[in-house]
């Protein structure tokens, strides 16, 4: 669910609207290898390390745009945002979708921009990747 929290942070930062141009838990690259026709930013996470109650997830923000210039500028702004403003984040919230929160958050610098797939018209799905460490809060007490 850390991917939903990052998605909500993107919405708060003005990168789009959840469910319209911001998505989590789905990929713009389909199982057939083809590319989704829905444009926007897709946020996904995968656990890369667990040390006691400290979790580290790899976050991927994939971009799918019709306009290559808009995509390039968005990726540039995202790199800056993650490496500057977002890195100072101490907690993340999944609100208003869920009441789940993540405290004691540490955001690591981006690892770069990758090309994940290409559609039938030569447009790329580009992604940035970075790690986020966090502690789980006891929500089921």
Where are these regions (language model features)?
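Short, charged interaction patches at domain edges and termini
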Residues: 1-9, 46-54, 97-141
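Small/polar-rich, solvent-exposed N-terminal microdomains that initiate assembly or binding
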Residues: 1-51, 85-101
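Alpha-helix initiation and capping sites
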Residues: 35, 53-55, 72
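Short, solvent-exposed beta-strand edge segments and adjacent coil->beta transition regions
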Residues: 56-60
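Short beta-strand-to-loop capping motifs
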Residues: 61-67, 132-134
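Extracellular/virion structural assembly segments
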Residues: 65-94
